[in-house]
Regions:
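C-terminal "post-core" interaction segments
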Residues: 1-207
Length: 207
């Protein structure tokens, strides 16, 4: 059965602009909150796609332990499920790693996304063009921000390491790789600091 939950007597206690930050580790209740803010167009969601936990569990006691049983699912007011898909941000921030490696969608036995009939609700009057404008400005900022470029540099390195097919166990080779890794880390950190007019590090150990 489907049971809608709401509070018709609720009052708006904050009337100024709102932004909610999320990442891949945002799950369950935080996804309900972010999804409601997005669906009501009450504010903008910033960050990365969330975990995608749209289910409710209960623990039953056994003679030798406990068993966790999934007993229900929760949905957005639009009828869209959160399970596996999560909440997609209005403005996406770069990540240093592949967020698809974790989350409900990464589990072989996870319940799949679905949807139900939406409920009636009234949206706030946020202009639809605002998000498009903010995204355009964000893309410019990504290309100009030393901190965001630093994150993208780490992500490139992550992808290279992730796709390596062979890992040497030779001690000499491992030491060479360690020196190269430290040199790379020093280079990108000093590149970021130089762009921000900060004092650069003389060595990896000084970081």
């Amino acid at each position: 059965s489907v049971r809608p939950w709401g509070d018709p007597r609720a009052k708006q206690v904050w009337k100024k602009p709102m932004a909610v930050m999320v990442d891949r580790y945002s799950a369950s209740a935080s996804e309900i909150f972010a999804g409601a803010i997005q669906d009501y167009q009450r504010g903008i969601i910033i960050g990365q796609k969330t975990f995608g936990k749209g289910t409710v569990q209960r623990l039953d006691n056994l003679t030798t332990g406990q068993i966790k049983i999934t007993e229900s699912k929760f949905y957005r007011i639009t009828g869209s499920g959160m399970q596996s898909k999560g909440i997609h941000p209005d403005i996406t921030l770069p990540s240093t790693w592949d967020i698809e490696e974790i989350g409900e969608s990464s589990y072989d036995t996870a319940l799949q996304w679905d949807e139900i009939r939406p409920v009636r609700f009234k949206k706030f009057s946020m202009e639809s063009s605002l998000i498009a404008q903010l995204n355009d400005e964000h893309l410019v900022r990504v290309n100009q921000s030393p901190n965001l470029q630093y994150i993208l540099d780490i992500r490139k390195r992550y992808e290279i390491q992730k796709n390596k097919k062979v890992i040497s166990l030779n001690l000499t080779n491992r030491r060479i790789e360690k020196d190269e890794r430290q040199s790379w880390a020093l280079d990108i950190e000093n590149k970021r600091r130089s762009s921000l007019n900060l004092q650069i590090f003389s060595s990896y150990k000084a970081m």
